Amino acid sequence: MVRVRADLQCFNPRDYQVELLDKATKKNTIVQLGTGSGKTFIAVLLLKEYGVQLFAPLDQGGKRAFFVVEKVNLVEQQAIHIEVHTSFKVGQVHGQTSSGLWDSKEQCDQFMKRHHVVVITAQCLLDLIRHAYLKIEDMCVLIFDECHHALGSQHPYRSIMVDYKLLKKDKPVPRVLGLTASLIKAKVAPEKLMEQLKKLESAMDSVIETASDLVSLSKYGAKPYEVVIICKDFEIGCLGIPNFDTVIEIFDETVAFVNTTTEFHPDLDLDPRRPIKDSLKTTRAVFRQLGPWAAWRTAQVWEKELGKIIKSQVLPDKTLRFLNMAKTSMITIKRLLEPEMKKIKSIEALRPYVPQRVIRLFEILETFNPEFQKERMKLEKAEHLSAIIFVDQRYIAYSLLLMMRHIKSWEPKFKFVNPDYVVGASGRNLASSDSQGLHKRQTEVLRRFHRNEINCLIATSVLEEGVDVKQCNLVIKFDRPLDMRSYVQSKGRARRAGSRYVITVEEKDTAACDSDLKDFQQIEKILLSRHRTVNNPIEDDSDRFEEFDVDSQMEPYVVEKTGATLKMSTAIALINRYCSKLPSDIFTRLVPHNQIIPIEENGVTKYCAELLLPINSPIKHAIVLKNPMPNKKTAQMAVALEACRQLHLEGELDDNLLPKGRESIAKLLEHIDEEPDEYAPGIAAKVGSSKRKQLYDKKIARALNESFVEADKECFIYAFELERFREAELTLNPKRRKFEDPFNYEYCFGFLSAKEIPKIPPFPVFLRQGNMKVRLIVAPKKTTVTAAQLQEIQLFHNYLFTQVLQMCKTGNLEFDGTSNAPLNTLIVPLNKRKDDMSYTINMKYVSEVVANMENMPRIPKDEVRRQYKFNAEDYKDAIVMPWYRNLEQPVFYYVAEILPEWRPSSKFPDTHFETFNEYFIKKYKLEIYDQNQSLLDVDFTSTRLNLLQPRIQNQPRRSRTVSNSSTSNIPQASASDSKESNTSVPHSSQRQILVPELMDIHPISATLWNVIAALPSIFYRVNQLLLTDELRETILVKAFGKEKTKLDDNVEWNSLAYATEYEEKQTIIVKKIQQLRDLNQKSIEDQERETRENDKIDDGEELFNIGVWDPEEAVRIGVEISSRDDRMDGEDQDTVGLTQGLHDGNISDEDDELPFVMHDYTARLTSNRNGIGAWSGSESIVPSGWGDWDGPEPDNSPMPFQILGGPGGLNVQALMADVGRVFDPSTASSSLSQTVQESTVSPPKQLTKEEEQFKKLQNDLLKQAKERLEALEMSEDMEKPRRLEDTVNLEDYGDDQENQEDENTPTNFPKTIDEEIEELSIGARKKQEIDDNAAKTDVLERENCEVLPVAINEKSRSFSFEKESKAINGRLIRQRSEEYVSHIDSDIGLGVSPCLLLTALTTSNAADGMSLERFETIGDSFLKFATTDYLYHTLLDQHEGKLSFARSKEVSNCNLYRLGKKLGIPQLIVANKFDAHDSWLPPCYIPTCDFKAPNTDDAEEKDNEIERILDGQVIEEKPENKTGWDIGGDVSKSTTDGIETITFPKQARVGNDDISPLPYNLLTQQHISDKSIADAVEALIGVHLLTLGPNPTLKVMNWMGLKVIQKDQKSDVPSPLLRFIDTPTNPNASLNFLNNLWQQFQFTQLEEKIGYRFKERAYLVQAFTHASYINNRVTGCYQRLEFLGDAVLDYMITRYLFEDSRQYSPGVLTDLRSALVNNTIFASLAVKFEFQKHFIAMCPGLYHMIEKFVKLCSERNFDTNFNAEMYMVTTEEEIDEGQEEDIEVPKAMGDIFESVAGAIYLDSGRNLDTTWQVIFHMMRGTIELCCANPPRSPIRELMEFEQSKVRFSKMERILESGKVRVTVEVVNNMRFTGMGRNYRIAKATAAKRALKYLHQIEQQRRQSPSLTTV
């Protein structure tokens, strides 16, 4: 028979606040919670739950809620609080309110009509009731603050409740909620307490509920075995320590001296006493508590520490003397103790000098020694130690650790203990570096404890609370627990079954300890008896529970396929596990919601159960148990089993019956997540990443490949018509040469083709004569050529490429005139006739050239030269070559001008030679014969063959142009002659003079020469455009099923244009963010100048790669990347922040010098020295109402007083004065509240009592304060608990006069669980009935949705999402008339222009005039949007976690890469710069070697693996075979404990990324990264979207293989209203419920704010429902809508930015997009439109978060200054475990904003234009602000902030959640981590964190400039 442990058999409990709220709605309840821990939450949410009745009009049955407070000053405070969180109108009433309430009942009624909730003082409410202005039955909720006052028989609370009870007998009465601080004082006798609690319950007619975190711990925590060990007292004086008296005397005298000295003026001197007092205090405390050995050790530490302070900086003499005095005291104490202590080398020797508690401690530990367990305890399997030892003081923790380490080294039997310690930060100042270090150390130690690397943790109370520690089996309370909290918390840490909880106590404390523990246990019982979760019981009071075998009650569930079996006894645990795996934020624990239903069968009570899973689970309906069970527990188990069955059928549990958790998803994400751009060796590049590159063949267009011309067959003539559209830039033409427009030439070049070639767009090339537009024009008539002509043409063609263009120099090409050449068109010179635009081949010219085809230059014989006569005509438009120079590399010159006045005898422009004659004779031994010839002024012909880009003058020319020039270049002629000279490029404005006689004239004229130089660029571009035209045709046919793909004769494509083509354009594309800012500030002229300069500097590449940190870059710039990494590693973290400071060094056991900072005093000495300003912690002690003084103006209301921790000094006088000021009644009114002046004027009969109370309170507090201060002096390092429970002593409030009527009312404390279940369900039913009957406004069915006038705005209509973009030019135009042919949605015309397709295929690496980046940005966001839309509508019941995963898979780079590869995209991509000499194959040439490099072996295999993963198959883990390459890489990647870590080593990268690891054939192959292919796919999507509009694009995406919904596919959108709760008797239950929610959360009001009226209201309700709100079963939660809205917003905003007339460059576009599409912005907008008031949630953590955030936003006045901290604030999706308190932005708020966008999109029938109108209305200000002052990405900003010293050092992936954590190191010793869904987010978060911290430091520096001078 299976015995079931009861505690494993309950569903995970809800948050206690939610539990309380649930009870409070169903029955009258008194909630007792400390300040801040959620009373506010419960009150406000209770009011919201009654919203339906409150918002109903008063005359139609609406009710009112009253919030009754004790003191006037609380009225406003509570009212403000309620207003922040709800849409209620809140009225305030107290004695001084002047509203005419009292004048007449009408006035009062008017007031009630206007306000839903009234916050009122008790006396006023009583008066209103007594005067019959108000009736209790018209209220629906009555909340009493500080309800313990009701014990006073004369108190108005009591009087109101008396009336209430009388009414109760025959009228409906409101729900009562009493709020009070904790009623359990540790020192109250339990019996007495019980009696008082009952009294209070009776007075308030309510039940006290004791749920709290503490009680939950008692209830659900483990029950360890408790032991008290009594030890001998430790009296330090009786140990006979040598020199004992001297030591004590030194302590006393030094302390007295330090305390009484008046040497230091508080404002003028550097006061060193803090560290000195600390050193004395701690050493003395250790001496007294742990004995001389520990004190000896501590003294050493301090000696060193003080020494460090003395050396650390220049200090004034007086200060130094003081420090030295202290150091001497320490040395003396050390020396006095040393002789004896040094000898100790074993635990026996130590025994006499330590308390017995320590020895006992070691005895307990010894029982965990594996040998001891085997031999003495006869255990088979040793139990591993996992212990926590709690001590009160930080120093004791440290000293114990030292002792343990030494004993471990002395005694082999303790070798198994691995101790460490953990303490909290004292100061609350989290920005200080030491508490950061401390926090890091704490997390690190706890992580090692989790992994069992440490098995014994010594801790202060910091671990009792909050910090999650794994289960341990031994908890030792070294100092006995002094209060209930400490007892329960520390006990709750022993969670493992069978663990022990040991308290060590000395004999003198035994009695006290004993009675305390008894009380604690009694009180625990009382508390538990009042915290019953009846629907999820732990205890079962039905009899017969133990008697039978649970599993026999119901058949187990078996999965046939795998044989997995689930029994009843394990079902609950599985459901708990499933719920915890559902997506939720960090504040929300999703738990199942169970209800037990008692049923009478033949007089026997049996039980059914009903289970609701969290609302984001696909199973939305209640799971009901059909057959009743004999008791409650089994009913729970049975319903859980049924739920598991349904979950398995839904596919939520896999066939092994395990939740399909995030682990498997994380595993997959690992393959597809984008990877770090940091360098880490040995990590194989992932498929789809930019690191993984492969080789692909280059492709030649079909038309050019098949154009081989045969003799005597007809062929087409194609002419290259060049037309100049712009003169050459003056900078490029410094000598002001005149050029003719080639359009006017009588001849041009063209080529012959056997086939017709498709029309392609004209395109620009940039020649010396200016910028040309090239058109490919077909001659009207075909032609034929004879075999002889063909041969001549081939020779001519070959001549052009070899002789003129010098292409075959390297011998890698050979001419092939057959059809084998990949590109086989022949180039011919053409004559053109202007009149009819006809072209003919100029054979005469061909023959001439071919006839003169010798190797140029020809060297004339001497006699020929003597005959030479100069003829100017020969040199016009000629190309000349000097023949007396290097003939290997001939140099060609254009003759620019003939200089008739220059002769060879003219003066030579260089001092070394007199004349030209002399120069040539001396230099070349050449005599010039014709002395009458004119000289020539010439220009270089450039060998730059890439003319695709505008010419940029200040690029140094290739040296091959002028390898060894000896032209007489003035003034450097001689200099450039020597071979070594590097100045061979003459400055372009200097003239170059040549002598005609020494020249050879080239047969080809200069004008044609220019055109020939353009041929490679022209052919290269024509090929590209033809290829993209083929792609266009493929898409038309395959994606759109079009027959016709050819262009008609009368239309042509618009020409290919670059962004940089015109200067006008240059102002349009905004490149750098800085520029964008200037554009908005400076005048436009400056702007143009600046942009122009920018454009000249960059070659199109540099400005785009913004923000990628590459260590190599740094090295290049000369930054030293240092390798100091010694800050926080190893043992040196040991003493971090023990008091507060970091240090380096290592603790070794033998080393006597213990480096150990007790306080970072140096920081203290230089930091703020004004007493109070330095207090950092602020824990208020006085309960005021219930806020932690969250009064109206916290800044100027004085804090009650603060417990001081942290670095500040203690200014006792100031403190006492403060306490006096706050608690002196005569001044209290003015200080406690600025709003109410006379707080004590209230009906007179209470005055005296209140004053007495105040007086008493005041004296108590003063007394407390004094005690505290003394205690503080005594032991400042006692750790404080995180928060102090407020408690109320009920005795103070009761009085002896018992009211008579109380006797008659029996206490209503239900006796059994069944009775309570009954009571709760009746309460719930009643409320439901009233809700349903309350009048509803605005619940009519709506015909259609509409955008309200407030949101209508012309600017949002500047473009339409349904149509193509206005910003795109590349359409069809009517031939020559330049008029656009437009095409509408259904008619896609002829597809996308080849030039746009080409842009979409050109990477930025190609350094061309265009790149795909802008298209890629828009394509990326449209792809995300389309995929999301598809997934949302196809996976209808999947929760957001699975949707997100499916989306990441679909849009991942590896998926796009795989699709792109299938479509052959890589062969079309332009990935490298055009280099005519190396990587271009000219027409009619073939490479001389046919070598082709293969791809790496595993490339194929990896692609296939990814293919399998993306198809959703299971991945089998392959053992990776290590190659020699991987060995080095092992270190960088490791997986432990569910975290995979990749460390990026510090090293400069060697070599260049772009270089392939293997040689490959440049002519036929290209090397492209996977990511470029993915980018190109996105860019193609983008370009189709912008040219054709969205619907055709979806067809194209479908053709690509992406999953999208097509326009014409009708997708059934199920109604958002879920109808599970409808029943035959109540068919409209769900609609009614929706109406209730609609009214309760005031959604009509919200619609007005956002400017949109919903047709389907359920969408809006769903958009506001948080997963924690279990009551809404009619819509589901917002997670799916958020998933959709996220993509909708992203796409709309990106598209809007894209359409902006300022045409942002890709970098800016991306930055603006990430600045606008992020959680922080969305959350602030949500708060701006008060979404939080309509938020449907039950989640305390989130509630407090939102409250803080709303305050933050209103302080900033809702302005989104992107560069302010606001943009830096962290949202919860970015946070790391254990750092929850860092969050400032509640992600939920951003999520609602996104889900509202999703809701509008769906409600408007998926209409983006409508959605954009509404969203633009909300975001307009933000968007405009952002564009005017764009933020920089945090990564970039960090790089600039600390340029030299930033390094991203490692990345970890948490496998459970799939999140990524990235670490960044700044200035070597500061580390910040960031979390995120993927690497990119995490990296940005880490950068944000670092920046935030650096900004803080910066600010502190600015604020205290005077202090840095010390």
Swiss-Prot record:
Domain Helicase ATP-binding: residue ranges: 20-201
Residues the entry annotates as binding Mg(2+): E1682, D1791, E1794
Alphabetical GO biological process terms: apoptotic DNA fragmentation; defense response to Gram-positive bacterium; gonad morphogenesis; miRNA processing; nematode larval development; olfactory learning; pre-miRNA processing; regulation of development, heterochronic
Reported cofactor(s): Mg(2+); Mn(2+)
Occurrences of domain RNase III (ranges): 1381-1589, 1643-1805
Lineage top rank: taxon: Eukaryota
Pfam family name, one: Dicer_dsRBD
Domain Helicase C-terminal residue range list: 371-542
Misc note: The avoidance behavior is transgenerationally inherited, and thus progeny display this same aversion despite never been exposed to this pathogenic bacteria.
Protein's UniProt name: Endoribonuclease dcr-1
Lineage: Eukaryota, Metazoa, Ecdysozoa, Nematoda, Chromadorea
